[in-house]
Amino acid sequence: MSHLDLTRHRTRSPSPSQIFGSSTTPVATNSTHSEPSASSILRSILGEYADPKRPDVSGADPIRCPVKRVHKTPAVRASSPGRENVPVRTLQSSKDAEGDNFSGDGQLTPCGGPRPLAERLSPKLLAKQTRRKGVGAQKRTKGCDLVDRILTGRSIKASATAASKSSDLPQPQRKGIPTLVKEANPGEADWEDEGLQLEPATKRKYSWTPVKDTNLSIIDLTANSGSSPPSIPGREAQKFTSLVSRYGFAETSPLAMKNEFPEDFPTRKRQLDLLQGTTNSSSSEGSSNKSSGKCPLKVNGTKGRRSRKVTTITSLSTAQYGLKDSPVESFPSVDTTERPSGKRSKSQTKKGGNKKPAGVSDFKVAPTTDALKSLEDQVYLFGTSSQLERVSSDEDKLGVPSAPASSRQSARDRTSVSTLSKYKVSRNLWAAGWRDLDGSVADIEIVDMVNIDTPKSHESSTLTLPSTSTNASNQGFSSQNTINDRSKPSQTTSTTTESTGVESGQLVVPSLCEDLSEKAGYPAVPERETLSSREIASSESAYIETMPSFRGFTTAELAQKVAAFGFKPIKSREKMISLLEKCWQSQHKNSAPTSLPANNANPPDSHASGQKNVVRCDTGGSNASHTTKRASKAPQKKQSTSSTSHSAKAGPKQVDCSQERPNHAYLPHDSTQASSQPVIVIPDSEESGDDFQDTYLGSLNRTSSTNYHPLSANSIPDGSPLFLRTISQASTEEKTSDPSDINQQITRAIKAQPRMTAINGMKRPTWLEKILMYDPIWLEDLTVWLNTEGLDRVGEDREVSRLTVREWCESKGICCTWKKPT
């Protein structure tokens, strides 16, 4: 079976118009320059086997496909600007006879011979064809599509490729079949086989990393051995030591900059450094310069840099830490001062007038130690004006002389610190406030409060009681009502002494007549037993070790003692007292704590006789001088009982007025005054006259660490009946108790106050709620509430003053104020 028969029996394949569709733009057949189409290629291959009576349809069965004639008109180009190169669609005529196909230009189609165009096209059809401007897909007939199209592009069918392969075989040429398609140019037919003949594209670089050297380098690991590997031509073998040597430590950096300047080349910057480097490099030149006697500076032609005068504080402070750069001094020479005599003479004359005297030295910054010493000598004022040292207002009012300047100076000397101590302490808030009166850091020393000297204000505080010889029968005195002093060691007979002196810490209470005691209505003082000398000696030694009563001191004295311990001034009196008590306890913590003798604190004996005695002070008579003796010394011997009773009978005005240590005696104007009235040191102008007098007298009754000073007779006004009255049992217990617990009682009373109900929707907060809400506390209202209701809730019978309440508020950090007078 031939190749033609095989192609006829194949399955019918689509026509070129069906493959490319209407998307392919047809080109006129009579165009001058066009690309070969698929149909022309197929005709060139199957030219000898093509049947003239059958249409040229690629891949179509010629037997089954009916033959129709197609009349083609010349391509009419559209006149519109957008359709210059678009041909008009060809028309098909169904009236044509079978077997006649003509192309548009009159050529013979494969199905028939050439026929004239006028016979096949009527004028009406020709006019209708020219009116059409759009180009669409050709109308399909019932048979095969016989339109010959010239395709654009370079697409090649797979069937054409297979046919081209089969065309290479020798095929017999049939007679009677004319050749319809001319052969194409040989250049146009070979482009498919040869390709586009473009240059190959360069390989794209995805990174700019340098190309690695793929050449192998031979490393000689056996450098010491005699055998060596064969060397590669053009490259020497590298040793392993040379490769590792680059990772070793190099004493001299290879990147060090070398001196590019010659030795004689002068530079403007870093002249001294360059000179020093050049002179050190060549020692031979230095020796030659020394031999010639000229300085290398002069040989090189460079001038030495003059040192600039220091004029700023920064340069002065950093001068001692700077490096001294003086290379000229390393080359001493006699001829170094020789310079050309022209300009040098003028400069020397100018410098001669500006020379300073030899004795005057340049100003230099003092060393650190000298600066610290100078700071020690400066006077600092630390704190506000209220904290500076000044005389208290209490001393001005009461007329108490201030402490001597020597004691203040000694206190300052004790608080002096070392030179560098203030720079060694830790810098915190406590260190900043821990200052003494001089402003330096406080250095606390232990002060001996027992052996302290007696102040001058207390030296002449002995009360002298003169005695006169009068008839004892007129006054009704009896020798049986004599009350012996319990502090007397013994009773001896002495008739030469006519007056009795009262020592510090001793009490002399003579007996008084019964009728006066009955008229006055004062409680009687029962007779007490006489103590032996051994008991009194033990009581004196025990009293020396007891704590002094700081509450009898004035505020100014307390402030001085607090300053003596090295503390800063404290406003609160209670705080100063508690601080002094703690300081005294810390000094005597090694010794066993001892209390006052029992005979000094006990109330009057209940087993005494029911005799009533009234003590009246005598303001007349002669004065006798007596010396004050310290309590540490042995007490003097007193008069015998007979002499004491005789002096008591001598006159009606002879009285020994004294006060017992725990039981303070009051000198009231009014007999109805309460005996348990507390003593307030700071007077208040708003208080009554009786309270102010008690305060004034209580402030004068001060105690020291070793002795007690009773009331002076000069401070008692004349012409007023003053009576001594002993204190009852209740008042004694109240006085002996520590008044510092009154602050605790105030705190308990405020916390114990119950919550109050609201009135008409208005809440009534308690004192504790007001304090917690930082409301201002009226001192008058709080004092009235404490005295009427608050202290009664905690079982406290004492009353507090407004000053006490104010001190309590300040100690707790409570906002308090006085009411404004209306």
Curated annotation (Swiss-Prot):
InterPro entries: Slx4_ascomycetes, Structure-sp_endonuc_su_Slx4. Its main location: nucleus. GO terms for molecular function: 5'-flap endonuclease activity. Residues 1-39, 73-117, 277-362, 390-418, 456-507, 589-676 are annotated as: Disordered. The keyword tRNA processing does not apply. CDD domains: SAP_SLX4 (cd22999). Phosphorylated in response to DNA damage. The keyword Ribosomal protein does not apply. GO terms for biological process: DNA recombination; DNA repair; DNA replication. Keywords: DNA damage, DNA recombination, DNA repair, Nucleus, Phosphoprotein. It is found in: Nucleus. Residues 13-39, 310-320, 471-484, 589-612 have a biased composition (Polar residues). Residues 342-354, 627-636 have a biased composition (Basic residues). Residues 280-294, 460-470, 490-506, 637-650 have a biased composition (Low complexity). GO terms for cellular component: Slx1-Slx4 complex. Regulatory subunit of the SLX1-SLX4 structure-specific endonuclease that resolves DNA secondary structures generated during DNA repair and recombination. Has endonuclease activity towards branched DNA substrates, introducing single-strand cuts in duplex DNA close to junctions with ss-DNA. HAMAP family: Endonuc_su_Slx4 (MF_03110). Belongs to the SLX4 family. Forms a heterodimer with SLX1. This is Structure-specific endonuclease subunit SLX4. The lineage of its organism: Eukaryota, Fungi, Dikarya, Ascomycota, Pezizomycotina.
